[in-house]
């Protein structure tokens, strides 16, 4: 074969067409088999060559990062997990077209990804094709020192110096320490089935290793703390004097030992040696059809014998990836024995000038001893020498290294490369179960990962994933079919495709995230950040920024989706770039929803040539200064928050905002940190807030913590009690959010502005996809459209079909006599499989499922957005509405009454003229917002407020405006979307111009603007008629008012010039009426009339400037002066009551006044003559007959004008007809006429 220099084992092994497993023996695996101690493995199919820039030598992270740097392996704490919702509509043919990949491409596309362990059908497709499907590039086998492997030629056997690379110092391995006593096996650990044949050691004679075929089977060892399904292949290492493998007879059950040297792992289960909090390194499985398997190098499974079809637990094995950036120079020898077995031997080429010193004879890595360590702290601080007794009495000694020496990805890669030097041969007729193939590596690099209170169990086993909870966005379904193409990892059905996509996104990595060497030599002059440039999606950090860019640009597979939020078709080539895009939506309070998912492997020549792959850690936190520690997070202050709904309780308490006025000191509310509800003593203010915000059970006798008075869900019984007392306005006034005790004067202000308690709402989480909705109708609509299945039921028989054509074909073939009948639609509940014949029944049925799904959500007080966490809402407020809040706070008093803009009159609207943010908030939110009142600003502020309101409402619907459905609380940025939604979802016909602030809609934009200005802004630009006495007639246009006055009252509105008014030469009266005249002039000139709720003609008595004619305060006792005054008034065109001196604009008003105030029904003689404006012909005094009663007809020669309302008629008949409209006046006139006769 010759020497070959290759960046990894995959490219190297892909050069040989050796069938590892028959394609007919593809494994069908389901999610129920995807659990392991390290959490269910979530694969990223087809991402075999997704290179992780771990060593980053090629990317510029600095060459030669020491593999023994223990601080590089510290896993980062958790940060919020990004979720992606997939509603796939891809056709199965799209995935079938990918099934014909070549072996080389398949090796790269279907290998272990940096995103996590390979899934069920992904593993099988990557390694089960007729051609050698390689496990991807995770094994860049090169020592960190830059040297290549050196083949050790020893007489008879080749001792495997497996761990010489991993000790803190090479000499530590040879120190003979007392052998550790064998510890008892874990509960349930049984003796694994014996191996049919012994593992073979490399022999020095010849460039390859020829295993003897007739070697007797080696008895399997009973491993310490290993389950019965986790036998492990003995990776024998030692000096030349170690016993030969052929000399080891088979034994039924050797005694249990600590650190069993077998590395064969059960493919069906992960070894329980690794607790759910300890990452487990797992092998890249290669399957062989009924023949001795060839185990590719993996950090934990150097030799994995396999036989037969693999079981379905493959996706629970996370494949560790190597992190060395140096290629491995190896020699491969492939031999097919006479019995049909295939032996593939990988040895290093002697190129390292200073190879590590060989260990003692028979040295092993005692994996079990490593994994026996507790989840958080290792048990051994230094190397230990353990003794293993084999079945024939032979005792082998091995060195067990502490966890600290194997903490980075580079070390794990070296271990994988070292282990790959040996091959295990099994005879064809082995009795080993397919699930016993090299499946579970017992965590060669156990790490103490941070804990999180809100861990979510993924998969059916309910195991906890490390670090933080990852929300499974789709229900797990068993994969229905395998993918059979070399390198093709795409499922053939949409459900399995979406399931595979979810496994990619939620995969767990069992190796720590890479940490670069951030201490470059002084002569380099590099200024590196304290924690490097870190990928928030996988936790890997890099020394240089371009290395992080290369990390995001790597090509592992092609993921093509349609982002529903961006409304664009996007293509991603790795998981980190996809999650980075999803995080951008998450920062805006949205969960990324995508559809039309298509996943394809990337050709080998299109992948970026990065030799290294490092597994991801799915959770990360922003970089923190100082050394990284591994505390148990989520149990106190500073707990890392997660965006998953299931981890809301683990977030740090949200403290009140510092927006309270100085008059209300906040410190007085926290003099004693004792809960007044349950008397629990807290440490400080943050502890008090955490006590009131942590999720807890409801009060005794209550089923939930939902307030029956308002739509609000409280976190626990203490918060609920304080909230209930808030409704009753009873002391003590305890804030349900922070637990502070406030005075009643400051309590409401604190709730509204500091703690934002009023922003809580009741939301509903979809039980299928975990998306939270703000209303019952919206989640019902979501469940019906997204998760419920609709069937077409045959009207004759009980059969139902998913499509109408299928039901029609069934009727045509099975019921020919009923072909004309139509199939009936039936609806299946997505949560309990109940079938309903009517859609409304299904909607009502959802109520019993939604009660347990209630969650607390938070609505932004300035826009309709809903948030699952209060902290996210506060960040949104700070980033989006900060300027508006500052302006509002500047103009806000210490405390004020709440005013709603919808009901305030014109004067109140003017008084809030400077409160521009209040108008903007009320115009952009669909819910009634409470705007604190402010001191009355100057009048000129009125115009900017109105312009701002009109500007905000005239927009096209973008920004914080938009339209919100009042039924389902869905928000739409575009008007057309809102109109279509109302018609489609709720069956309501909405006109083209709907109002953002209420449910009314209009046919034209001017009508909408007028509606908003009058009804919502309180600026009533209307024109009331002064002459109408019946009702309050107002007009929206001055032109319409003038026409009305001309037609109805027979007056010219233009004749009411500013000169109209009292011109008495009396100083006091003139001074009293001067302001009135000026105000009326100003009102007429700016076209702003008083509100029609108060008739302008009847101004308040004593208000000299309220109307056009105030009451005449001067009254004379002599009739002469009265007549003089009356003459002046008549000439001036006004009407005055001679009894009290009040002036009126029309005779009708004067008549009504005299009848109500003075009980006079007759005419007023000359004093009641109709006054005309300047320029009009003056009516003769004889128009009203003082002795003629209430006759509608005027005196001879006068115009035909009604004396009640002053309307002019063209004929006496029309005047009589008109006079009938005055009711009692007409009746009295008839009665008077009869009396005269």
From Swiss-Prot:
Keywords: Cytoplasm, DNA-binding, Isopeptide bond, Metal-binding, Methylation, Nucleus, Phosphoprotein, Repeat, Transcription, Transcription regulation, Ubl conjugation, Zinc, Zinc-finger
Segments forming C2H2-type zinc fingers: 533-552, 705-727, 764-787, 792-815, 827-849, 858-881, 963-986, 993-1016, 1135-1158, 1200-1222
GO cellular component annotations of the record: cytosol; nucleoplasm
In-chain residues carrying the UniProt-annotated modification Omega-N-methylarginine: 1060, 1101
Tissue: Widely expressed with highest levels in obvary, muscle, blood and lung.
Phosphothreonine: modified positions: 148, 377, 900
Feature: compositional bias, Polar residues: 234-244
Compartments, record wording: Cytoplasm; Nucleus
Keyword match Transcription regulation: yes
Pfam families listed in its UniProt record: zf-C2H2, zf-C2H2_11, zf-C2H2_ZNF592
Single Gene Ontology MF annotation: DNA-binding transcription factor activity
Composition bias type Low complexity, residue spans: 97-111, 297-310, 915-925
Compositional bias (Basic and acidic residues): 880-890
Region (Disordered): 1-80, 96-330, 880-957, 1051-1121, 1159-1195
Glycyl lysine isopeptide (Lys-Gly) (interchain with G-Cter in SUMO2) cross-link, chain position(s): 285, 336, 372, 384, 397, 422, 435, 439, 451, 464, 954, 1043
Entry-annotated residues carrying Phosphoserine: 102, 129, 140, 227, 242, 251, 253, 266, 271, 374, 433, 495, 1057, 1082-1083, 1085, 1106, 1118, 1184, 1191, 1211
Ranges of Pro residues composition bias in the record: 132-144
Pathology noted in the entry: Paget disease of bone 6: An autosomal dominant form of Paget disease, a disorder of bone remodeling characterized by increased bone turnover affecting one or more sites throughout the skeleton, primarily the axial skeleton. Osteoclastic overactivity followed by compensatory osteoblastic activity leads to a structurally disorganized mosaic of bone (woven bone), which is mechanically weaker, larger, less compact, more vascular, and more susceptible to fracture than normal adult lamellar bone.
UniProt family annotation: Belongs to the krueppel C2H2-type zinc-finger protein family.
Function noted in UniProt: May be involved in transcriptional regulation.
PANTHER family named in the record: ZINC FINGER PROTEIN 532-RELATED, ZINC FINGER PROTEIN 687
Quaternary structure and interacting proteins, as annotated: Interacts with ZMYND8.
Stated name of the protein: Zinc finger protein 687
Species assigned in the record: Homo sapiens (Human)
Source organism phylogeny: Eukaryota, Metazoa, Chordata, Craniata, Vertebrata
Gene transcribed to yield this protein: ZNF687
């Amino acid at each position: 074969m010759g020497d070959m220099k290759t960046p990894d084992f995959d490219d190297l092994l892909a050069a040989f067409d050796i069938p590892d497993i028959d394609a007919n023996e593809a494994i069908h695996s389901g999610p129920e088999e995807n659990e392991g101690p390290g959490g269910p493995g979530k694969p990223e199919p087809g991402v075999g060559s997704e290179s992780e820039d771990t060593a980053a030598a090629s990317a510029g992270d600095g060459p030669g990062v020491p593999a023994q740097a223990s601080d590089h392996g510290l896993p980062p704490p958790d940060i919020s997990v990004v979720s992606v919702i997939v509603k796939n509509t891809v056709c199965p043919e799209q995935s079938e077209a990918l099934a014909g990949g070549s072996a080389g491409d398949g090796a790269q596309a279907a290998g272990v990804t940096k995103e996590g362990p390979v899934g069920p059908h992904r593993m099988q497709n990557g390694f089960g094709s007729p051609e050698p499907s390689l496990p991807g590039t995770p094994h860049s086998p090169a020592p960190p020192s830059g040297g290549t492997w050196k083949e050790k030629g020893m007489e008879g056997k080749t001792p495997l110096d497996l761990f010489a690379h991993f000790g803190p110092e090479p000499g530590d391995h040879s120190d003979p320490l007392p052998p550790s006593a064998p510890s008892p096996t874990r509960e349930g650990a049984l003796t694994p089935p014996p191996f049919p044949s012994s593992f073979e050691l490399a022999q020095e004679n010849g460039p390859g290793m020829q295993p003897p075929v007739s070697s007797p089977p080696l008895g399997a060892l009973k491993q310490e703390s290993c389950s019965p399904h986790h036998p492990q292949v003995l990776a024998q290492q030692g000096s030349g004097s170690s016993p030969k493998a052929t000399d080891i007879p088979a034994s039924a059950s050797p005694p249990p030992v600590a650190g069993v040297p077998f590395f064969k792992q059960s493919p069906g289960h992960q070894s329980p040696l690794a607790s759910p909090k300890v990452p487990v390194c797992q092998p890249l499985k290669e399957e062989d059809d009924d023949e001795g398997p060839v185990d590719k190098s993996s950090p934990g499974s150097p030799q994995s014998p396999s036989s037969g079809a693999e079981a379905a637990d493959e996706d629970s094995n996370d494949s560790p990836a190597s992190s060395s950036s140096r290629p491995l120079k190896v020699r491969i020898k492939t031999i097919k024995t006479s019995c049909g077995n295939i032996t593939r031997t990988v040895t290093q080429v002697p190129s390292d000038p200073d190879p590590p010193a060989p260990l003692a004879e028979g040295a092993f890595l005692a994996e079990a001893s490593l994994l026996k360590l507790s989840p958080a702290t290792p048990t051994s601080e230094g190397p230990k020498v353990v003794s293993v007794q084999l079945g024939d009495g032979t005792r082998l000694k091995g060195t067990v290294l502490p966890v600290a020496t194997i903490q980075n990805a580079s070390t794990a890669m070296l271990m994988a490369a070292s282990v790959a030097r040996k091959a295990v041969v099994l005879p064809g007729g082995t009795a080993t179960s397919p699930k016993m193939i090299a499946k579970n590596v017992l965590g060669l690099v156990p790490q103490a990962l941070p804990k999180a209170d809100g861990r979510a169990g993924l998969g059916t086993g309910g195991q906890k994933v490390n670090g933080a909870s990852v929300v499974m966005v789709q229900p797990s379904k068993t994969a229905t079919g395998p993918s059979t193409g070399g390198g093709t990892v795409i499922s053939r059905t949409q459900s399995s495709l979406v399931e595979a996509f979810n496994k990619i996104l939620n995969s767990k990595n069992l190796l720590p995230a890479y940490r670069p060497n951030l201490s470059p030599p002084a002569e380099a002059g590099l200024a590196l950040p304290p924690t490097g440039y870190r990928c928030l999606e996988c936790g890997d950090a890099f020394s240089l920024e371009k290395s992080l860019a290369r990390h995001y640009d790597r090509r592992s597979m092609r993921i093509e989706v349609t982002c529903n939020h961006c409304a664009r078709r996007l293509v991603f080539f790795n998981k980190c770039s996809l999650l980075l895009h999803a995080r951008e939506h998450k920062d805006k309070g949205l969960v990324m929803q995508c559809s039309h998912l298509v996943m394809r492997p990337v050709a080998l020549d299109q992948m970026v040539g990065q030799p290294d792959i490092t597994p991801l850690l799915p959770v990360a936190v922003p970089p923190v200064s100082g050394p990284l520690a591994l505390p148990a997070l989520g149990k106190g202050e500073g707990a890392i928050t997660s965006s998953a709904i299931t981890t809301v309780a683990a977030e740090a308490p949200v403290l009140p905002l510092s927006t309270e006025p100085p008059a209300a000191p906040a410190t007085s509310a926290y003099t004693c940190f004792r809960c007044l509800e349950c008397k629990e003593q807290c440490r400080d203010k943050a502890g008090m807030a955490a006590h009131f915000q942590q999720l807890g059970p409801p009060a005794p006798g209550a089923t939930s913590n939902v307030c029956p008075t308002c739509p609000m869900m409280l976190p626990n019984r203490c918060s609920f009690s304080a909230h209930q007392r808030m409704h009753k306005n009873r002391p003590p006034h305890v804030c349900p959010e922070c637990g502070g005790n406030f005075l009643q004067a400051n309590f409401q202000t604190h709730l509204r502005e500091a703690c934002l308690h009023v922003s809580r709402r009741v939301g509903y989480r979809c039980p299928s996809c975990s998306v939270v909705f703000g209303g019952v109708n919206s989640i019902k609509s979501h469940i019906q459209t997204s998760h419920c299945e609709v069937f077409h039921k045959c009207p004759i028989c009980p059969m139902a079909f998913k499509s109408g054509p299928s039901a029609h074909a069934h009727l045509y073939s099975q019921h020919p006599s009923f072909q004309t009948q139509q199939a009936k639609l039936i609806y299946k509940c997505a949560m309990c499989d109940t079938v309903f014949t009517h859609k409304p029944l299904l909607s009502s049925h959802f109520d019993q499922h939604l009660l347990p799904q209630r969650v607390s959500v938070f609505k932004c007080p300035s826009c309709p957005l809903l948030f699952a966490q209060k902290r996210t809402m506060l960040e949104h407020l700070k980033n989006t509405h900060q300027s508006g809040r500052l302006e509002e706070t500047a103009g806000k008093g210490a405390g004020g009454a709440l005013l709603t803009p919808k009901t305030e009159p014109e004067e109140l609207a003017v008084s809030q003229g400077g409160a521009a943010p209040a108008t903007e908030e009320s115009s952009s939110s669909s819910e009634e917002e409470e705007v604190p009142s402010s001191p009355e600003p100057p009048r000129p502020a009125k115009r900017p407020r109105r312009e701002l309101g009109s500007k905000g409402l005239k927009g096209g619907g973008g920004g914080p405006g938009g339209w919100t459905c009042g039924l389902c609380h869905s928000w739409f940025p575009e008007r057309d979307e809102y109109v279509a939604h109302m018609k489609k979802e709720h069956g309501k016909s909405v006109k083209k111009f709907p109002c953002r602030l209420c449910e009314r809609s209009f046919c034209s934009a001017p009508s909408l603007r007028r509606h908003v200005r009058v009804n919502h802004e309180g600026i009533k630009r209307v024109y009331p008629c002064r002459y109408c006495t019946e009702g309050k007639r107002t007009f929206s246009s001055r032109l319409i008012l003038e026409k009305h006055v001309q037609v109805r009252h027979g007056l010219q509105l233009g004749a009411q010039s500013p000169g109209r008014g009292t011109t008495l030469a009396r100083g006091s009266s003139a001074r009293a009426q001067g302001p009135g005249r000026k105000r009326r002039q100003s009102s007429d000139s700016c076209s702003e009339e008083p509100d029609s709720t108060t008739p302008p003609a009847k101004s308040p008595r004593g208000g000299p400037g309220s109307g056009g004619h105030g009451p005449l305060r001067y009254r004379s006792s002599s009739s002469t002066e009265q007549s003089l005054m009356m003459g002046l008034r008549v000439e001036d065109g006004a009407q005055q009551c001679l009894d009290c001196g009040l002036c009126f604009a029309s005779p009708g008003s004067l008549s009504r006044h005299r009848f109500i105030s003075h009980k006079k029904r007759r005419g007023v003689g000359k004093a009641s003559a109709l006054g005309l404006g300047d320029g009009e012909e003056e009516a003769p005094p004889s128009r009203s007959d003082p002795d003629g009663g209430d006759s509608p007809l005027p005196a001879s020669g006068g115009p035909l004008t009604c004396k009640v309302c002053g309307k002019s008629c063209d004929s006496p008949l029309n005047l009589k007809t008109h006079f009938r409209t005055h009711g009692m006046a007409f009746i009295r006139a008839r009665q008077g006429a009869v009396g005269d006769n």
